[in-house]
């Protein structure tokens, strides 16, 4: 039996548009981002996908993308689970900074390492910083020591995998079709795990906003195939645009 899993990065956010490091900052979708959510829903509808359950983060750009896509799918009624473990990677002291200005200051190669390397985190956010997640009531029930002040992709994967094993994988093994709407780096972490991508290869992976990525898995959740829905060239161009965000102007 083929299991189906769709990974969907949220639509364009205001800070995507502004080219700023976002991380755990809870920013809104742009008008384009809301349109991308609807377009993603249409692509999934055209594919004939009928989901049994959906998962998302506790950040509204992902939540609102999921809501827009499900409305277009006429599957608003689906049970939705929200977890901080699907949040974007925490960008530490870079959060809120302009990516191009940061590249001009520190060099494009350093910014690429911070953005796309596997195990090198950006400079940490101090725990006394008002933006640290320990001061956000949505994380009030969590162990303060579990809340990051910065993350690499490696530590993001460590955060995401328990949710995969405890929540998503059992549903897939039960034959359910699952939609996960999350963020560039939490989805890169899942992609790396599912496709057994090397630490070096993951550096070059960029996930575009608002384009569903369909995985077909076997009974053991090994990947049989994966592809972006819609025009492959459009997905390629969108991924290249993500890669260019970390370059100096």
Curated annotation (Swiss-Prot):
Site, as annotated: Transition state stabilizer: 183
One Pfam short name: His_Phos_1
Domain of life: Bacteria
Binding residues for substrate: 9-16, 22-23, 61, 88-91, 99, 115-116, 184-185
Keywords in alphabetical order: Gluconeogenesis, Glycolysis, Isomerase
A single MF term (Gene Ontology): phosphoglycerate mutase activity
Active site: 10, 88
EC number(s) stated in the UniProt entry for this protein: 5.4.2.11
Enzyme class: isomerase
Pathway: Carbohydrate degradation; glycolysis; pyruvate from D-glyceraldehyde 3-phosphate: step 3/5
CDD domains hit by this protein: HP_PGM_like
The UniProt record lists the keyword Oxidoreductase: no
Reaction(s) the record says it catalyses: (2R)-2-phosphoglycerate = (2R)-3-phosphoglycerate
GO process annotations (BP): gluconeogenesis; glycolytic process
Subunit and partners: Homodimer.
Function: Catalyzes the interconversion of 2-phosphoglycerate and 3-phosphoglycerate.
HAMAP family named among the record's database cross-references: PGAM_GpmA
Family the entry assigns: Belongs to the phosphoglycerate mutase family. BPG-dependent PGAM subfamily.
Listed name of the protein: 2,3-bisphosphoglycerate-dependent phosphoglycerate mutase
Native source species: Xanthomonas oryzae pv. oryzae (strain KACC10331 / KXO85)
Phylogenetic classification of the source organism: Bacteria, Pseudomonadati, Pseudomonadota, Gammaproteobacteria, Lysobacterales
Gene: gpmA
């Amino acid at each position: 039996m083929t299991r189906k899993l769709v990974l969907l990065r949220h639509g364009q956010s205001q800070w995507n548009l502004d080219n700023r490091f976002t991380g755990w900052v809870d920013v809104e979708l742009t008008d384009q981002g809301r349109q991308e959510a609807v377009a993603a829903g249409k692509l999934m509808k055209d594919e004939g996908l009928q989901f049994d359950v959906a998962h998302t983060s506790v950040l509204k750009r992902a939540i609102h993308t999921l809501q827009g896509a499900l409305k277009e799918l006429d599957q608003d009624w689906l049970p939705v689970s929200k977890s901080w473990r699907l949040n974007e990677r925490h960008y530490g002291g870079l959060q809120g900074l302009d990516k191009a200005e940061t590249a001009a200051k520190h060099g494009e190669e350093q910014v690429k390492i911070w953005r796309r390397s596997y195990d090198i985190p950006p400079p940490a956010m101090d725990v006394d910083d008002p933006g640290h997640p320990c001061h956000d009531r949505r994380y009030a029930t969590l162990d303060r020591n579990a809340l990051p002040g910065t993350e690499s992709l490696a530590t993001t994967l460590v955060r995401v995998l328990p949710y995969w094993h405890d929540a998503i994988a059992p549903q897939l093994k039960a034959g359910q079709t699952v939609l996960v709407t999350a963020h560039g780096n939490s989805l890169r972490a899942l992609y790396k795990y599912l496709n057994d991508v090397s630490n070096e290869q993951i550096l070059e992976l960029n996930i575009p906003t608002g384009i569903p990525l369909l995985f077909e898995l076997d009974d053991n959740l090994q990947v049989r195939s994966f592809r972006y829905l819609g025009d492959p060239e459009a997905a390629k161009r969108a991924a290249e645009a993500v890669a260019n965000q970390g370059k100096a102007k």
